[in-house]
């Protein structure tokens, strides 16, 4: 090997090392920019009045022998013409067992309150139990707003013919508060799936019961990017979740507790606080 050849090899090695070092420096993250979360969760207030309706008055069967989805939906529809930023509609579900044969849609300025001992049971094979309506078809956070779901139990009740489903789904909206709710029995989906929502509070809830082999979270935070990631919530404009507080919940007998398994390049979840939750008998990952 000539002197010129040795010199060239040494020079090439030095250049390669310099390039490698430059690459490392380019991708180093400045952790001093992290300032902590500013999450406050859902902000639902300012009502000057409220109207209360009872699902039994619309024909719901609290013994669970017949379909109550039409009756409950009629009660929820009351908010379309009667709810506003100044008037909240409280929909009461008394103690009992209510069978639903199709999904429910909830509108802006609605407080869906299930009394102690009230259980809503899914009795169909495809689709979620409840989702927010999309009255105006807006993207971003511009669809429904100010929705509260409190108390009771939502039983996914999967059957041998069930397709993967989420118990609850919410997207393109602002201010969602889920409080003191038991959500159980999911098949290959999420107990609560949330995409493109700003202002989220989930507290004092109990998530449990999962069948299937998919590695799904009980609570999934998502972006609304395409029909594979978050179907049926057009427009697909990459809206992420922002300002989420998930606290004091119980997760058990599940594969995963909470998290996200999708992302969009350059789009980030912001202001998320996860605090005081308990996880036990998890076969996969807590968070």
Predicted regions: what is each one?
Residues 55-92:
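Acidic Gly/Asp/Thr-rich repetitive segments characteristic of extracellular carbohydrate-active
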Residues 115-118, 145-156, 174-185, 198-211, ...:
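Right-handed parallel beta-helix
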